[in-house]
């Protein structure tokens, strides 16, 4: 029987893929692993403790913060600061980027951007939620505090990205630019084991994921694409299946495994879409491209967009390559 590889063993193995690697990125990923275990424990007992529901505060986007959002944010920040490989973090839950003040952190080479608990409003009803993270090499001089420019880098500069999905089982999925690998958590041992090696998304899928309750507000091209998905054309595998959980990590994870497309377009009330370029779209774009798929804002590759602000939003279309190409064609054919 083949020995099961742990996440820690796999990270050390893959360190050899990077010439002159000194282990700093490996240590950084280990800190994310630790924080994920802590957050997973709290999520699993959320219904028994006073940590579900709203905190009474809003984040910078005006969205009501959940208690577990804030808990996850603090745990990930603490884990990242403790390892000394990160000079600062930017979080969906923070108004501004946070610079770590310890001298060792100032000498660190990396910054981390994260959505500490995506889909947290679903916890009350026991729906899967997740953590999304993105890692960049800083551009400011080592030994100085991080600057805004360290965080406002296009997605094509990412050195690693991934997510943790807290569901029927807990998984950590990540890439360092050499494919996508998934690890399933064994709570009895407190260990992540390699369970999904070299994950690939099919070029074609049969699932489309979108909140159709907003249909009336969608651009014409998106409306036409939805009708295309619903047409009865058996020889082309249509109609497709509509599956929408409302938790980006959960919808993305299913489509990555099965093949499909996730759509969050612009609407009349949100002309730039609702998802954040830095905390959600860029890391998912890096993952999907490494798995053989595509991510677009409807006209441009997501990872080529130069950010102008920390909490910038963009329309988001991500998934199987041919499905993303198709929705781009509809948006080009039916401009509003």
Swiss-Prot record:
Record-listed substrate binding positions: 118-121, 211, 244, 262-264, 274
Record InterPro entries: FBPase_C_dom (IPR044015), FBPase_class-1 (IPR000146), FBPase_N (IPR033391), FBPtase (IPR028343), Fructose_bisphosphatase_AS (IPR020548)
Compartments where found: Cytoplasm
Cofactor(s) named in the record: Mg(2+)
GO molecular-function term, one example from the UniProt record: magnesium ion binding
Catalytic activity: beta-D-fructose 1,6-bisphosphate + H2O = beta-D-fructose 6-phosphate + phosphate
UniProtKB keywords: Carbohydrate metabolism, Cytoplasm, Hydrolase, Magnesium, Metal-binding
Chain sites annotated for binding Mg(2+) 2: 115, 118, 280
Co-factor note (free text): Binds 2 magnesium ions per subunit.
EC number: 3.1.3.11
GO annotations of cellular component type: cytoplasm; cytosol
Gene Ontology biological process terms, A to Z: fructose 1,6-bisphosphate metabolic process; fructose 6-phosphate metabolic process; fructose metabolic process; gluconeogenesis
One Pfam family cited in the UniProt record for this chain: FBPase_C
Amino acids binding Mg(2+) 1: 92, 115, 117
Recorded metabolic or biological pathway in which this protein acts: Carbohydrate biosynthesis; gluconeogenesis
EC class (word): hydrolase
Subunit organization: Homotetramer.
HAMAP family associated with the record: FBPase_class1
Family statement drawn from the similarity comment of this UniProt entry: Belongs to the FBPase class 1 family.
UniProt xrefs under NCBIfam families: PRK09293.1-1, PRK09293.1-3
Protein name as catalogued: Fructose-1,6-bisphosphatase class 1
Organism of origin: Vibrio cholerae serotype O1 (strain ATCC 39315 / El Tor Inaba N16961)
């Amino acid at each position: 029987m083949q020995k099961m590889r742990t996440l820690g063993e796999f990270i050390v193995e893959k360190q050899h893929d990077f010439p002159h690697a000194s282990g700093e990125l490996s240590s950084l990923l280990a800190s994310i692993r630790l924080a994920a275990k802590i957050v997973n424990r709290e999520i699993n007992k959320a219904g028994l403790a006073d940590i579900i529901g709203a905190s009474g505060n809003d984040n910078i986007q005006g969205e009501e913060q959940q208690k577990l959002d804030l808990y996850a944010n603090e745990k990930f920040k603490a884990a990242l600061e403790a390892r000394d490989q990160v000079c600062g973090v930017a979080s969906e839950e923070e108004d501004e980027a946070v610079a770590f003040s310890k001298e060792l952190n100032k000498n660190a080479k990396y910054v981390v951007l994260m959505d500490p608990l995506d889909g947290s409003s679903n916890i009350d009803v026991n729906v899967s939620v997740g953590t999304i993270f993105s890692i960049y090499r800083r551009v400011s001089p080592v030994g100085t505090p991080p600057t805004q420019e360290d965080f406002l880098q296009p997605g094509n500069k990412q050195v690693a990205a991934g997510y943790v999905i807290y569901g029927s089982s807990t998984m950590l999925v990540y890439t360092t630019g050499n494919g996508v690998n998934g690890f399933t958590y064994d709570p009895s041992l407190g260990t992540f084991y390699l369970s999904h090696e070299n994950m690939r998304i099919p070029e074609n899928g049969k699932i489309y994921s979108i909140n159709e309750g907003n249909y009336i507000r969608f651009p014409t091209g998106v409306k036409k694409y939805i009708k295309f998905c619903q047409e009865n054309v058996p020889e082309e595998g249509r109609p497709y299946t509509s599956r929408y959980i409302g938790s980006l990590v959960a919808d993305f994870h299913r489509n990555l495994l099965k093949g499909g497309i996730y759509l969050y377009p612009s609407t009349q009330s949100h002309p730039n879409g609702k998802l954040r370029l830095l905390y959600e779209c860029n890391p998912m774009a890096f993952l999907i491209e490494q798995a053989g798929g595509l991510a677009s804002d409807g006209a441009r590759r997501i990872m080529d967009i130069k950010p102008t602000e920390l909490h910038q939003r963009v329309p988001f279309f991500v998934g199987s390559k041919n499905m993303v190409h198709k929705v781009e064609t509809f948006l080009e054919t039916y401009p509003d």
